[in-house]
A protein has these predicted regions:
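Periplasmic polypeptide-binding modules associated with outer-membrane biogenesis and secretion
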Residues: 1-92, 122, 127
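Short glycine/serine/proline-enriched coil/turn segments at secondary-structure junctions
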Residues: 64-67, 93-96, 111-113, 182-183
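Transmembrane beta-strand segments that form the barrel wall of outer-membrane beta-barrel proteins
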Residues: 28, 60-61, 82-92, 102-103, ...
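Secondary-structure transition/capping motifs at alpha-helix termini
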Residues: 50-55, 76-82, 107-116, 155-156, ...
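Amphipathic hydrophobic-ligand
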Residues: 97-101, 249-251
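Hydrophobic, well-ordered secondary-structure elements that form the walls
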Residues: 48, 105, 148
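Transmembrane beta-strand segments of outer-membrane beta-barrel domains in Gram-negative
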Residues: 16-19, 29, 83, 134-271
Length: 271
């Protein structure tokens, strides 16, 4: 029988506990004055293991000199919250050479609840060959992506027992992409809010795309490209012409998958 969880001690560079007490409580399934349970021990390890802010967890028990009681100590070692990475790239698209650079910033514990903030900046340049009749032969692309992921459901009216039973994430994401090609200029702005979770058995997985918006804006199309490909009113170019118009696409989706070794089931609904 566990008498008390004596204390929770975090070991990091600053010797400070970086997680809120509520986060620790919600991810601890061992109970004070409750019976020792191997299932609850494994579940506690699993829950702390999925937190981005946690590097590793160690749970130990000490027998008390009186009765059949234990003290439980949970030690948490946290990751460094901030990381920055820089990555140069070389590109080769159908023989056209180019270069790209990528800068990524991550914060694994933004609000002291193991929230993951990711900001990704990317710039690319490519010299395009084989084009005739255009003012330039350069392709430029600049992309900014940002996402914030919570290791839990961010939604009202959910019972605490349901929140503790499942492994869930809530994610909001934004992206802006700027493309300048010799044939056209394109801007893409997108945003999404989604939930993902799986039940305790890990066989069932769910995803709800509560909101998924994509806006495509074409500020400029060269006269030659329009004349060669878009002004033809035949059915052959109808789909091609649609791809170079301003578009606003909104989507709601639900995905379900079941996987148990020998067989799997997948279902997807979008509207």
């Amino acid at each position: 029988k566990i008498n008390t969880i004596n204390y929770i001690n975090a070991e990091d560079n600053n010797s400070k506990l970086g997680l809120r007490s509520k986060v620790l409580k919600n991810n601890t399934f061992l109970k004070e004055d409750g019976y020792y349970s191997l299932k609850d021990l494994r579940k506690t390890y699993e829950r702390f293991g999925r937190l981005q802010a946690v590097k590793y967890t160690n749970i130990s028990f000490r027998e008390l000199p009186y009765g059949e009681q234990l003290d439980c100590d949970i030690y948490i070692n946290t990751n460094k919250p901030n990381t920055i990475s820089f990555q140069p790239e070389g590109t080769n698209t159908a023989g056209d050479l180019g270069a790209a650079v990528r800068l990524e910033y991550m914060n694994r514990n933004l609000f002291k609840g193991s929230e993951l903030l990711s900001i990704d900046l990317r710039g690319a340049y490519e010299a395009i060959t084989g084009l005739e009749g255009y003012n330039n032969d350069n392709f430029e692309e600049y992309t900014v992506q940002a996402s914030l992921m919570f290791p839990r459901f961010i939604a009202p009216f959910l019972a605490r027992s349901f929140r503790r039973r499942i492994n869930a994430t809530s994610e909001v994401a934004l992206m802006y992409d700027l493309q300048n090609r010799p044939e056209y200029h394109r801007r893409v702005l997108s945003g999404a809010w989604r939930y993902k979770w799986n039940d305790a058995n890990h066989h069932d997985r769910y995803q709800i795309d509560l909101l998924d918006i994509n806006y495509v804006f074409m500020p400029w199309i060269s006269d030659k490209f329009r004349e060669d490909y878009l002004d033809d009113n035949t059915n052959r170019n109808a789909i091609l012409r649609y791809n170079y118009e301003d578009l606003l696409i909104m989507k709601f989706g639900f995905r379900y998958s079941y996987n148990k070794g020998l067989y799997a089931i997948r279902a997807n609904i979008e509207t």
